Regions:
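Short secondary-structure junctions
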Residues: 160-165
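Flexible, glycine-/basic-rich loop-and-beta segments that form/coincide
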Residues: 183
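The AdoMet/dcAdoMet-binding core of the Class I SAM-like
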Residues: 1-133, 139-152, 156-158, 170-175, ...
Length: 183
């Protein structure tokens, strides 16, 4: 995911503008911390439904230290929002260059984000040339691949290009954290 975002950030920088990123699901805030530290032209909104997760990330996963060192929260490059990511996205008028779905409930991805409606809402909130990235916990093939199949089908109806970067390329029937990319 970071590689795709880095490339898009360089392109935005070449155009003299910020990269607009929405991260749905903060968790341990690994990606937002990376963006704050290494992608200075990114303006990132992170939506985490559970305030306790944000508190844990601040206290145990060095989120506060990262924000202090980078100044990303103070200068508006990183905004932390405790809300339901799906509802938040639906309420926005903003167009994003990158939407990252890193929201999970156990092993399940954010429910609406694997439906036709979810794909339409994401498409409607992406700027021209924008990209949707999602962590999809699923096998790529076989009986445990239904989630990934549903995501591919729904987003395939809305996007010209959909790809999967499998966690277990040599074991496609093994469930893994696959990266789904739609453009």
């Amino acid at each position: 995911m970071a590689d795709v975002i880095d490339r898009m950030a360089r392109s935005a920088q070449g155009q003299g503008r910020q990269l607009r990123v929405l991260v749905m699901g903060g968790g341990g805030y690994s990606l937002p911390k990376y963006l704050a530290a290494y992608v200075p032209n990114a303006r990132v909104e992170v939506v985490e439904v559970d305030p306790a997760m944000t508190k844990i990330a601040r206290e145990q996963f060095f989120l506060d230290e990262c924000l202090e060192v980078t100044g990303a929260e103070g200068d508006g490059r990183l905004t932390l929002i405790n809300d339901d990511a799906w509802g938040y996205l639906q309420r926005q008028d903003e167009l994003y260059d990158v939407i990252v779905n890193d929201a999970f409930s156990g092993k399940r991805p954010l429910g609406p984000m694997k439906t036709d409606e979810g794909a339409r809402v994401v498409r409607a909130h992406l700027a021209d040339g924008g990209v949707y990235l999602a962590n999809v916990r699923s096998a790529c093939e076989g009986r445990r691949s239904a989630t990934l199949r549903e995501v591919r089908e729904a987003f395939g109806r809305e996007f010209a290009s959909c790809h999967v970067v499998p966690e277990w390329e040599d074991e496609p029937e093994k469930p893994g954290n696959n990266v789904f990319i739609a453009r």
